[in-house]
Swiss-Prot record:
Family: Belongs to the class-II aminoacyl-tRNA synthetase family.
Pfam families assigned: tRNA-synt_2e
Keywords recorded for this protein, A-Z: Aminoacyl-tRNA synthetase, ATP-binding, Cytoplasm, Ligase, Nucleotide-binding, Protein biosynthesis
Keyword NADP applies: no
E.C. designation(s): 6.1.1.14
Gene name for this UniProt entry: glyQ
UniProt-listed HAMAP family: Gly_tRNA_synth_alpha
The protein's name in its UniProt record: Glycine--tRNA ligase alpha subunit
GO molecular function: ATP binding; glycine-tRNA ligase activity
């Protein structure tokens, strides 16, 4: 199979998809909802729960309303992309697999300065944390490596390995440009470059105005409360997947309220706690749902061990 042209943003994504598909990952499509990071995708957050084997890779558009800069900052956007890889259980050679992906992109670890800098990760809203590293390529952070220890307040057993590529940053390095907007997204049939700015600059300008000045605060507070109530109701109904969608909607409403500066510092902590409580309830409900199914994707010995432990705890 020929390798995509990694000198374009489009080709870079295709090359990462190709590489991780060859490593046996389920290549998924982006989640069709607003999330702040690829970790929120059910393929990471929910699949990290329980003993079942899971390997996947996907691009995830990520929205962080407070990071908008009206299209004026060459390195900071309120909408950008992550390439997410989830390997469960985390393989012993995960670091070698990652370095292999860089080679596939034309970045030779023998030539370039690649450093793993300890940087443990935490998501207060998801009740998740892990041991990890930032990966620096010639002095610029391009990837976050995390070994999940806990998700939704539940211990990760086995541990899930997560690799999150900052694909705009890698593309800026490969294309040797100083502004995200100057990245070549692809080349038109007539040879004209289509840039990242052609695709997204207007969106950054307008969405920054929306996030900071026009998002309806009353509607967002109401949305948060409604999604919170819906999530709780769905958990009671034994439906963790739609309940989790409500968690993501509530989280995005919170992020927009944060951008509108509608939440005080003390209120902010209270909102984070409300989302975390929902996420924990979803995590437990998802574990229980998979337990009821007998953890069909888990190796037999591990499945039996976790089921026996869950049954013993249930009898206490």
């Amino acid at each position: 199979m020929s390798k995509p042209d990694v000198s374009t943003f489009q080709g870079l994504i295709l090359a990462l998809q190709q590489y991780w598909a060859e490593q046996g990952c389920v290549v998924l499509q982006p989640l069709d909802m607003e999330v702040g990071a690829g970790t929120f995708h059910p393929a990471t957050f929910l699949r990290a729960i329980g003993p079942e084997t899971w390997n996947s890779a996907y691009v995830q558009p990520s929205r962080r309303p407070t990071d908008g800069r009206y299209g004026e900052n060459p390195n900071r956007l309120q909408h950008y992309y992550q390439f997410q890889v989830v390997l469960k259980p985390s393989p012993d050679n995960i670091q070698e697999l990652y370095l292999g992906s860089l080679k596939h992109l034309g970045v030779d670890p023998g030539i370039h300065d690649i450093r793993f800098v300890e940087d443990n990760w935490e998501s207060p809203t998801l009740g998740a944390w892990g041991l990890g590293w930032e990966v620096w390529l010639n002095g610029m952070e391009v990837t976050q490596f995390t070994y999940f220890q806990q998700v939704g307040g539940l211990e990760c057993y086995p541990v899930t390995g997560e690799i999150t590529y900052g694909i705009e940053r890698i593309a800026m390095y490969l294309q040797n440009v100083n502004s995200i907007y100057d990245l070549v997204w692809t080349i038109s049939p007539d040879g004209t470059p289509v840039t990242y700015g052609d695709v997204f600059h207007q969106n950054e300008v307008e969405m920054s105005h929306y996030n900071f000045s026009h998002a309806n605060v009353d509607f967002l507070f109401q949305t948060f409360d409604t999604c919170e109530a819906e999530s709780s109701k769905l958990i009671d109904a034994g439906l963790p997947l739609p309940a989790y969608e409500m968690v993501m909607k509530a989280s995005h409403a919170f992020n927009l309220l944060d951008a509108r500066q509608a939440i005080s510092v003390t209120e902010r902590q209270r909102f984070i706690l409300r989302v975390r409580t929902l996420a924990r309830n979803v995590a437990q409900a998802y574990f229980d749902a998979r337990l009821k199914l007998g953890f069909p994707m888990a190796p037999a010995a591990l499945r039996d061990e976790v089921i026996a432990r869950a049954n013993a705890e249930g009898e206490k």
